[in-house]
Design a protein with these regions (language model features):
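C-terminal regulatory/oligomerization modules of transcriptional regulators
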Residues: 1-11, 60, 136-153
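Pre-recognition alpha-helix immediately N-terminal to the DNA-recognition helix
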Residues: 21, 48-52, 114
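N-terminal helix-turn-helix DNA-binding core of bacterial DNA-binding proteins
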Residues: 27, 31-74, 78
């Protein structure tokens, strides 16, 4: 077979590519997450929006679509589409902001809170099993991920 002139600094050893290793590990983790969330009729982005909303409601009285997008680092339009779907599912609701009639606030319904409480143990269980294989290195991984995120803001 003809040898290709592959213009990569990792052409002789793909195991040296941090990006490739990261994306492979991410895909394995993400497949587990998607599979478990599917059993309770949620997608991963829906889970992120629901849990972000729940977390923000613990910290502040009113939560907007923009708050959810900012906190979850998701595109505002994507969050808007997900919110529309979650409203149809009866998991969240929109209300007019009590202090600004031009704005909406997003609230969890009782059914939405139940769904969050059903989903969290599934996702956290996957996290514990998947990242637990690192044993005592999980905290180091977390610190490195925080450092990467902060350095690339």
């Amino acid at each position: 077979m003809k040898q290709l002139d592959f213009n990569s600094i990792y052409k002789n050893d793909s195991q040296q590519s941090t990006g490739l290793l990261f994306i492979r590990a991410y895909h394995k983790w993400h497949e587990l997450i998607k599979s478990q969330l599917k059993t309770i009729d949620l997608t991963h982005p829906q889970f992120v929006v629901l849990t972000t909303l729940a977390a923000l409601l613990r910290q502040q009285e009113w939560v907007s679509q923009t708050d959810i997008a900012r906190f979850s680092d998701m595109d505002v339009m994507t969050v808007s589409q997900i919110i529309r779907l979650l409203v149809k599912k009866g998991l969240i609701m929109r209300e007019v902001h009590p202090k600004d009639s031009r704005a909406n606030i997003i609230l969890l319904t009782e059914q939405g809170l139940q769904k969050v409480n059903q989903a969290l143990p599934l996702v956290e269980g996957i996290d514990q099993a998947f990242f637990g294989k690192l044993e005592d290195k999980t905290e180091i991984l977390n610190q490195l991920l925080i450092e990467l995120e902060t350095a690339n803001d």
